[in-house]
UniProtKB/Swiss-Prot annotation:
Main location: membrane
NCBIfam families, alphabetized: NuoC_fam, NuoD, PRK06075.1, PRK11742.1
Top-level EC class as recorded in UniProt: translocase
EC nos: 7.1.1.-
Region (NADH dehydrogenase I subunit D), start-end ranges: 213-599
Species this protein is from: Sodalis glossinidius (strain morsitans)
Keyword Ribonucleoprotein part of the UniProt annotation: no
Keyword Transit peptide among UniProt keywords: no
Bilayer topology annotation: Peripheral membrane protein
This protein's encoding gene: nuoC
Region of interest called NADH dehydrogenase I subunit C, as start-end residue ranges on this chain: 1-189
Protein name as it appears in the record: NADH-quinone oxidoreductase subunit C/D
Amino acid sequence: MTELMTQNSALPVWQSQDHQDDPVIAELRNHFGPDAFSVQPTRTGIPVVWVKREQILKVLTFLKKLPKPYVMLYDLHGVDERLRTHRQGLPAADFTVFYHLISIDRNRDIMLKVALSENDLHLPTCTRIFPNANWYERETWEMFGMTFDGHTHLTRIMMPKSWEGHPLRKDYPARATEFDPFVLTKQKEDLEMEGLTFKPEEWGMKRGKDNEDFMFLNLGPNHPSAHGAFRIILQLDGEEIVDCVPDIGYHHRGAEKMGERQSWHSYIPYTDRVEYLGGCVNEMPYVLAVEKLAGIVVPDRVNVIRVMLSELFRINSHLLYISTYIQDVGGMTPVFLAFTDRQKIYDVVEAITGFRMHPAWFRIGGVAHDLPRGWEGLLREFLDWLPKRLDSYVKVALRNSVLRARAEGVAAYGAKEALDWGVTGAALRATGIDFDVRKWRPYSGYENFNFEVPVGDGVSDCYSRVMLKVEEMRQSLRILEQCLNNMPAGPFKADHPLTTPPPKERTLQHIETLITHFLQVSWGPVMPANESFQMIEATKGINSYYLTSDGSTMSYRTRIRTPSFPHLQQIPSVIRGSLVSDLIVYLGSIDFVMSDVDR
């Protein structure tokens, strides 16, 4: 088990910091020299270092080999800098590629940035250092046009092969009305269908061996065990999986592009739909990141309300996960039982927020309104109901000998492989790594709650992953019990000029507040020019928002890092040599939805 150090800072999280005192800055200076890079002050809460393109692979390798290494490539993506006006003190750049690394031993992050000119968008691939960079580099090339030299398959990943242009560039249209009317001719249809034809040679696969042909089988994109619009092309030798290629993007909606056209306030409903089972959990990292930009400190009551709603949705998501997992293995009854339990959660959520799946209820600086009368009774009823139901799921289904035979030891991997592929959440903790953001990087007051983090015994397989989720639900019940018994008094919104919308009561008395209310609701609040970042422990792993403000009513760049994206990229490395039936159990054990993958 890895010991972690909780991050500490004497400065408020919204103040710009360059983190010059972070030990990694001194280590980089000692190794590469003081002039090898520059440090950017931000409100991200982590060191942000600009590195020369020629040095990026050396720096990445150095960080991964430190005594307390930065072992995980958490994120990699790009920014179109051409229209950004507030760039004082930053290296000249038309485009930027950033690398976000995590050190588990240090419980610290670092972000590396590489400046690129529009005339030369080449930089070397880092897939030999971090294998999970594969998909991130493909998406960055697709969305911005940066070419990662040495990448073995730099092709489109979210968009159809026939798509033209790079959608996240600033000169690319953001609305359908800015395009010509779409007409699907027979010729275009044939072209699209041809683009979906799998050609093994493009992926370095052989069509056969020893005078025998392999079978190539499409699992999905419309298969019940694919859990959404998701295709996996299987290379089969009988029932054995020789290799496979996950094919994603069918659910891509351009969530990050939408963030550039919505105000800071009006983007909140879009966050619910990134991982559509998570509800308020999705809103948490976004509003916290915006509040860092604004310098808002919310009241204690807001923190506890947000935690309460997040844990309700965590249980709701986990219930659907374990019931559909059991269904994938062959047990039907738990699905119907779980929907009864989830209905009780929705009763509580609807009474509090007015909505069920997608509340869009968190606000910049607070929540939409205060808790209603009688919420305590609804929550009390649910807390009394669920523990016995969890016991029955474990006793009747999860300890079933058939299920255990199908799941134990299947699709198993250890801590090193999990970190190499960017795995987070219960799948990572099943390998024995005790890393839960709620504990080690507390947000929204989680440090004030008493709960345990379930951790596995060193191997993450199809059985340990689901059993950890059951224990996580029990811990969420503990947190909810504390919310019920210790709900603070006080306002449900912060008293801050950028709280959106401002407290309604004052608009009836002060003309300045009325004007502010009108402007913030119609145009949106103006956030200070800066960058902020917030990660949380979401239902399926670590989710985060990396926001860039250019001093406007809208985000200049909204980067959404979701846990399901790297989890699906890992599939081939885990399932090679297994049977097709094992793949079905493995897919059920991952816990993903395609909106979380494709955004």
